[in-house]
């Protein structure tokens, strides 16, 4: 069923605190299976203030007499329409086989999945076509592409680096995690050519072009060390930098492991996560800048020396940010949007109990010049709709829409759906479009919804964890100029520059 809604947001009323015991018993909040999720809460035994609040939020959403959207029911603003949807192909069509990140090149979209990746032909966005899929287990399998190469992140401890590997504890020295490299010249037959092991694996990676066109670098983000893990020892205050010769990718290797937090990051215990590495880094090569979302900290980096990134400024929000997850620059490089993945992506945080400032985006202006640049907080943005207790919902991956004269972003919110919002005025962001699919289940929490939602060459593409690939068309006067912008290749964490007024 499709519901087109010109009305205001759905609203759910709150319920008494006492509902926790009745509604949850000893049930734990569901979380994605990726390593390092900061909150996995048993609501019956919750004592930490943040854990209790997440449980309260679940109870609040569950106690409403407003049914919200039905299972798979669609609601949207009038200016955003779904024009195509392809389900996950077998064997990726199981509940535990989660779709992850997206990359683009020419007429192709590359969709990561915890069990491998899929290549789609999107020459006709209204009729995308599956070209090939590679079965290669190892979550999250975030993808990036450059020329004839595809890079895949493995942050799931494996028995070896092959695509036939099995799960094996990181406490075993011989276990493997890191980067896999594929030759994708033949899109119908990708070929695995190289692996590079990295400390603590590769939760995500960021492709950073070298100033010489002979190489690319991968900034590898990983976290959650343990004294029991031989290849992931504390304090792990670093990133790994992999250098890839484009003409001989089999020579790819780790060339540096710079410490991002040599004096230690956020110690935790203050409402935020303990910093033991970065979750995600967005590079803006045109500006020689990067922004790191690093668990309990946000950082602005100078990457003019690609093998020696330097922290220019570091920020922390112990009031509203639980887990610094990802970052997006505006096109002029004067703002950064950081996201807070409160609840690790597995909790229902889009409700009145949690409120509008947590599990949200934080917009920072970049002020000053050179090494005197600083990040100055301006405002928060969170979707205004309330989701139910079986809908994991929090800020997640998005991209700029390449609009002239404005700062507009499209973003995934898991089961909160897709939001298009304008942060041209960084102190007063506003939503201008949305699209949402109803819960995967109305009886239990199933990790679902859009993982990554990006704008590419005139259309919005969304990798839905359970449902597959969605394509949407945004028709709004504020974004009309974006239809004229074409990128030959797009890895969203490698932010491209486009002409602006």
Language-model region placement:
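Secretory targeting and sorting signals
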Residues: 2-35
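Feature marking well-ordered beta-strand scaffolds used for ligand recognition
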Residues: 19-20, 35-501
